[in-house]
Amino acid sequence: MKLTPRERDKLLIFTAALLAERRRARGLKLNYPEAVALITAALMEAARDGKTVAEVMHYGTTLLTRDDVMEGVPEMIPDIQVEATFPDGTKLVTVHHPIP
């Protein structure tokens, strides 16, 4: 299978997000990379599902709470930026304070 660098990045994000989902389901608090991967993958999927940029940005703030992550993680993630594929093309999505 031949993948472009962007496709490899997306696959890596998805894999890390899947691991984060499993750990969260077991009741573990997520660390920084797990939280970023979970939010990033969810944003990419929401865009692919046809949501608008504004909807994806808002959705990004509803995925995790402070109770879901280790202490200090929300402060380490002031914003998340991801290039997501929407029905009308690729756009940069920025979510400010994704873990309120």
Curated annotation (Swiss-Prot):
Subcellular location: Cytoplasm
Family statement: Belongs to the urease gamma subunit family.
Lineage top rank: taxon: Bacteria
Organism: Paraburkholderia phymatum (strain DSM 17167 / CIP 108236 / LMG 21445 / STM815)
HAMAP family reported in the protein's UniProt record: Urease_gamma
Name listed for the protein in its UniProt record: Urease subunit gamma
SUPFAM superfamilies for the chain: Urease, gamma-subunit
EC code(s) of this entry: 3.5.1.5
Single GO molecular function: urease activity
Subunit-structure text: Heterotrimer of UreA (gamma), UreB (beta) and UreC (alpha) subunits. Three heterotrimers associate to form the active enzyme.
Enzyme class: hydrolase
UniProt cross-references to InterPro entries, sorted A to Z: Urease_gamma, Urease_gamma/gamma-beta_su, Urease_gamma_sf, Urease_subunit
Pathway(s) served: Nitrogen metabolism; urea degradation; CO(2) and NH(3) from urea (urease route): step 1/1
Alphabetically ordered keywords of this record: Cytoplasm, Hydrolase
GO BP annotations, alphabetical order: urea catabolic process
Pfam families cross-referenced by the UniProt entry: Urease_gamma
Cellular component terms (Gene Ontology): cytoplasm
Catalytic activity of the protein: urea + 2 H2O + H(+) = hydrogencarbonate + 2 NH4(+)
Record's keyword annotation contains DNA-binding: no
Main localization of the protein described in the UniProt heading: cytoplasm
